[in-house]
Amino acid sequence: MLRDVQRMAGVSNSAAYRHYADRDALLAAVTDYAETRLADAMVARMNAVANRGPKAKRALGRLRATGQGYIDFALAEPGLFRTAFGHSGVGRGGHTRQAEGAETQIKSHHPFQILIRCIDDLVAVGVISADRRDGLDEAVWAAVHGLSTLFLDGSLSEADAHRKKLISDRLLDVIGGGLQ
């Protein structure tokens, strides 16, 4: 992908490396850009949820919207979506190891952090009890990411847009229903 961009820009293959310390720094910057764009899409969908009505319904609506934003982004920007998750050890899921055994740090405007805040909101408004909280972030992430990946590169890649929308709606229904 980088070489395609360099060719379109009319610069040499080594030009990008003049701006970064090494290959890992360059890949981290590209990954960060892709993750930020994905997070922006999720937040845009979440912000479109009406801010009136029962708190529980709003919180569930925001969670659903972030999931839909995630799936929509994957379908609209498959290259960026793959880039956000395609470089092992670089920006992987927004996680950065500070030291051996240190807790994982996640940047605040990362798709996973947005999901965490949505689930925290569900606990705060009483949709989910605190004792059911552990593991929900990863479970919801896996479901939405898995479906997005199946749409792009898996057995659902040949499904038409209508079918993908139907399947997305069903998955988001199952997630929302399972949390209540």
Show where each model-derived region lies:
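Short helix-capping/turn signature of helix-turn-helix
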Residues: Y20, G86-V90, A142
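Amphipathic alpha-helical packing segments from all-alpha helical-bundle domains
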Residues: K57, G93-V127, D134-E138, L166-G177
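Amphipathic C-terminal alpha-helical segment
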Residues: F73, R117, D121, W141-A159, ...
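Short helix-coil transition/hinge motifs at the ends and kinks of transmembrane helices
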Residues: A48-A59, G91-A102, E158-D160
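Helix-turn-helix
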Residues: M1-A25, A29
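Short, flexible helix-adjacent loops and helix caps
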Residues: V43-N51, G86-G89, A124-V127, L152-L156, ...
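Alpha-helical structural segments
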Residues: M8, A25-A48, G61, A65-D72, ...
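Amphipathic alpha-helical segments used for helix-helix packing
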Residues: F73-Q98, T149-S157
